[in-house]
Curated annotation (Swiss-Prot):
Protein function: Catalyzes the methylthiolation of an aspartic acid residue of ribosomal protein uS12.
Gene source species: Salinispora arenicola (strain CNS-205)
Designated name of the protein: Ribosomal protein uS12 methylthiotransferase RimO
Binding site for [4Fe-4S] cluster 2: C205, C209, C212
UniProt xrefs under Pfam families: Radical_SAM (PF04055), TRAM_2 (PF18693), UPF0004 (PF00919)
Note on cofactor: Binds 2 [4Fe-4S] clusters. One cluster is coordinated with 3 cysteines and an exchangeable S-adenosyl-L-methionine.
UniProt biased composition (Low complexity): 155-172
Cofactor(s) essential for the protein: [4Fe-4S] cluster
UniProt-listed Enzyme Commission number(s): 2.8.4.4
Length: 507
């Protein structure tokens, strides 16, 4: 690898950060943006005119990998230097570098603290040896509470002091557990100006789901301390963020490595109390770890969306066992019933895999039964495919590609129908809509049961009898509305009154 002092970037050089995949990657890109900005780079999300393009890749499933490759190739056609970072780069390392000569460098997560020097080396024409991938779970202690002591790069876990490399401008800042949140340094630079932002609770995963390769390249589960999260939440609020979306590989596990397996229940009201934040949304919940206290905290805490992003993956017990997961149709329905007993209008979404090795017609029928009874607001259906290095890739009982596609098409159509029906059940109900955008008079936002990008949206229309002035609404406004129509999973609603106006907006 190139040493940290092999190149020094010049002020004003333009770098584009292109982000693929999940919201966790978006947070990682904003950490990279902060590190680069601290060294004088002009950071953009538009590749036009950039001297170097960094593609923060996704390596989750085959389609995501193909999207990453296509983005890297398209970036190379602009004439800019191209650098692959992110999950696919971490997962394949030297193999990716050898197969993709269009990329001048393939970086590991371990390169992130020195990203400025790495890009400087690329522009100087210095070759950077790609890493040999390794199982990042083995880099951290088996005992969860000792993991934060390990010197391992964890994207999204940086501090401002860490941003100062050999050529950096940021002075180290000493903090301890007594430092107030508003005085803690934050290593992040927003690449989006919208009223919603993700807040990364943790990285990695300790589960061993047979189909998933993520723990091997993201590592074991490591939580961020509450005080660090509160500092970042306050900083995000000062930039205009109104909704925080809590992300990780498994948010239900938050705090177990901090000695407090109930830490998320305590953190939620603290985040909701941050000045300027009107909604906190938890995501990536594991059903087996979604305990009654966590259900209650999400369902009843003021300022926290009654929204349950539950990773069911299937509902047939035999399939779940082969996946190395836990649960059944009845257990999952009981969990949803406990949610709705506390918050009848709570939102619920999940993803499901069809065609997993050994899946039978009876298993599919059981999944169909669950979907028909679950009343989920949003359903994602994925067709199974073997992933390198996973246990499932070596399982017997593979389902033919033709059968997988048939089941995928059937379940996808059912999901669309059921989610549209669930949306219709909200007709006449009152929802709180956070305005995301106002474009040519079209006001669009999301109700509490709608997460950004994946769960549909709510379009606001002018009330017939006066009331809220639609033309006066701005991104970041939180508005009480009545649902008047639906379009698939999307809602149409009339604003009844302002709950909380976005601060600092001229009206």
């Amino acid at each position: 690898m190139v040493s940290a002092t092999s190149a020094s970037p010049a002020d004003g050089r333009r770098v584009a950060l292109l982000t693929l995949g999940c919201a966790r990657n978006e947070v990682d890109s904003e950490e990279l943006a902060a590190r680069l900005h601290a060294d004088g780079w002009q950071v953009t999300t538009d590749g036009e005119g950039a001297e170097v393009v960094v593609v923060n890749t996704c390596g989750f499933v085959e389609k995501a990998k193909q999207d990453s490759i296509q983005t890297l190739l398209a970036a190379a056609e602009t004439g800019a230097k191209v650098v692959a970072a992110g999950c696919m780069a971490e997962r394949y390392g030297r193999e990716l570098a050898d197969s993709l000569p269009e990329a001048q460098a393939v970086l590991s997560f371990d390169d992130y603290p020195d990203i400025s020097d790495r890009l400087g080396a690329v522009l100087a024409g210095t070759a950077i040896d790609a890493h040999t991938p390794r199982d990042r779970r083995e880099l951290l202690p088996l005992t969860p509470v000792r993991r934060r002591e390990a010197a391992v790069s964890l994207p999204g876990h940086g501090t401002r002091a860490a941003a100062a490399g050999p050529g950096g401008r940021s002075a180290p800042v000493e903090v301890d557990e007594h430092t107030p949140a508003h005085l803690r340094p934050v290593l992040r630079r927003r690449l989006d100006t919208g009223p919603v932002a993700s807040l990364k609770l943790a990285s990695g995963c300790d589960r061993r789901c047979a189909f998933c390769a993520i723990p091997a390249f993201r590592g074991a589960f490591v939580s961020r301390p509450p005080e660090e999260l509160l500092a970042e939440a306050e900083w995000l609020a000062r930039t205009g963020v109104r909704e925080l979306v809590l992300v990780s590989e498994n948010s239900s596990s938050y705090g177990k490595d901090l000695g407090d397996p109930r830490a998320l229940e305590k953190l939620l009201p603290q985040l909701a109390a941050v000045d300027g934040i009107v909604r906190v949304r938890a995501s990536y919940l594991q059903p087996a770890e979604t305990r009654p206290g966590l259900v209650e905290a999400i369902a009843t805490t003021p300022g926290v969306a009654a929204y349950f992003d539950l990773s069911f993956q299937h509902s047939s017990e035999p399939v779940l066992r082969r996946m190395r997961r836990f649960g059944s149709t009845e257990r999952f329905l009981d969990l949803l019933a406990s949610v709705r007993a506390l918050a009848p209008e709570a939102g619920a979404r999940s993803n499901f895999i069809v065609g997993f090795p050994g899946e039978t017609r009876a298993d599919v029928a059981e999944l169909v039964r669950f979907l028909n009874e679950a009343r989920l607001d949003a359903i994602g259906v994925f067709d199974y495919s073997d992933e390198d290095g996973t246990e499932a890739a070596g399982l017997s009982g593979k389902v033919s590609a033709t059968t997988v596609k048939r089941r995928y098409d059937r379940l996808g159509a059912l999901a669309d129908e059921l989610c549209a029906q669930r949306a219709e059940q909200r007709l006449g109900s009152t929802v709180q809509v956070l305005v995301d955008s106002v474009d040519d008079g079209v006001v669009e936002g999301r109700a509490a049961h709608q997460a950004p990008e994946v769960d549909g949206s709510t379009t606001l229309v002018a009330p017939s009898g006066g009331g809220v002035d639609l033309a006066a609404l701005r991104p970041g406004d939180l508005v009480r509305c009545t649902v008047t129509a639906t379009e698939g999973v999307d809602l149409v609603a009339v604003p009844d009154g302002m709950i909380s106006a976005a601060p600092g907006v001229a009206r």
